[in-house]
């Protein structure tokens, strides 16, 4: 009787140890599979959906552990990290994606933080029309930047050639603003919140890509097609958390600002410009179903045709993968977030 009892206890212990071992293996497997690293090229409000989804537990709700990293170094750096496999998702500009695909990468735009532009062309109050810019010095950050593209698109909309103005590389928006104030340049392509500062000191907006309905993929979320294909379930769950982050951002101003102040290290009492920028992102820039714009992609292709001749005939959709967002819209998932 004693031997049978001992044998039963031993057998039970063995089964328990085996069960615990299986649970540990499964937990370890899930933990490894469910980690996602997201990279940003800069500290920006365009990062809000990911930051908010992290802080509010939206990713955790879908069994995902995220690590959001600000890499810096411009749009190409975060894109390179995605291509190398160091990041699963990255935030970058549409032009960088087009260049990468033409260079042989299997990268694709899977969502958009902002299909239009965060820049505005700021001028002195006495500049009444675009024609008054002829021969004037217009400041941009660098040639080939999103601000440069925004300027070229605005000039095209006004039926003006780039040669009709002087395009000058000045540096970041704050530096351009100082140059504008001192008369070093006559106009400047500034981004938020610097164009608010310019408005507050007497300058005015002559060109606004949003008001002019100009799309050029200011900020997009990318992933490799290979990763999306082999990690379909995980990528889909990530996108659920992402669109919940978008919805919370658009619908909950106070809470969103609190999170953004923390992430962007803005001291309390100094959030005036952040709040004004929030208004633009919540109502004009971010969309409930954040599809990358085919129209914006076409625009980018038109301007890259000199560098890549095949851009003239390229299909904009070859740079886009809507397979993560479309099921969420078609199923009504996104709609329920706004009810």
What role is predicted for each listed range?
Residues 174-266:
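Pocket-lining segment of extracytoplasmic ligand-binding domains
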Residues 229-312:
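Secondary-structure end/capping motifs
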Residues 146-161, 165, 241-273, 320, ...:
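Ligand-binding clefts/hinges and TM-proximal coupling segments of bilobed small-molecule sensing domains
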Residues 1-11:
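N-terminal secretory signal peptides that target proteins for export/translocation
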Residues 301-339:
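Conserved C-terminal helix/tail region of periplasmic/extracytoplasmic solute-binding proteins
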Residues 13-27:
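Bacterial N-terminal signal peptides
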Residues 34-182, 186-192, 205-209, 214-215:
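Short, glycine-/small- and polar/acidic-enriched structural segments
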Residues 30-34, 336-339:
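Bacterial Sec-exported substrate-binding components of ABC uptake systems
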């Amino acid at each position: 009787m004693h031997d049978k009892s001992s044998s039963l206890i031993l057998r039970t212990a063995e089964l328990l140890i085996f069960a615990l071992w299986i649970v540990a293996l499964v937990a370890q497997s899930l933990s490894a599979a469910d980690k996602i690293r997201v990279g940003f090229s800069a500290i920006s409000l365009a990062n809000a959906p990911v930051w908010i989804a992290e802080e509010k537990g939206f990713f955790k709700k879908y069994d995902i552990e995220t690590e959001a990293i600000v890499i810096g170094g411009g749009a190409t750096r975060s894109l390179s990290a995605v291509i190398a496999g160091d990041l699963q998702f990255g935030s970058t500009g549409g032009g960088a994606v087009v260049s990468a695909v033409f260079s042989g990468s299997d990268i694709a735009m899977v969502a958009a933080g902002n299909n239009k532009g965060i820049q505005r062309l700021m001028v002195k109050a006495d500049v009444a029309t675009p024609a008054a810019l002829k021969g004037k010095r217009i400041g941009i950050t660098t040639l080939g930047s999103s601000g440069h593209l925004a300027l070229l698109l605005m000039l095209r909309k006004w039926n003006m050639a780039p040669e009709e103005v002087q395009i000058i590389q000045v540096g970041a928006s704050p530096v351009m603003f100082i140059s504008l104030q001192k008369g070093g340049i006559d106009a400047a392509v500034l981004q938020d919140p610097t164009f608010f500062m310019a408005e507050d000191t007497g300058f005015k907006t002559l060109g606004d890509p949003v008001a002019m309905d100009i799309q050029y993929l200011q900020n997009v979320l990318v992933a490799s097609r290979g990763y999306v294909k082999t990690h379909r379930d995980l990528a889909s769950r990530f996108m659920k958390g992402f669109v919940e982050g978008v919805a919370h951002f658009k619908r909950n101003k106070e809470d969103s600002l609190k999170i953004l102040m923390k992430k962007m290290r803005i001291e309390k009492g100094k959030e005036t410009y952040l709040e004004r920028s929030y208004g633009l992102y919540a109502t004009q820039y971010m969309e409930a179903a954040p599809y990358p714009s085919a129209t914006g992609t076409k625009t980018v292709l038109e301007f890259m045709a000199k560098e890549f001749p095949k851009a003239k005939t390229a299909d904009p959709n070859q740079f886009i993968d809507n397979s993560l967002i479309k099921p969420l819209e078609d199923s009504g998932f996104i709609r329920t977030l706004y009810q």
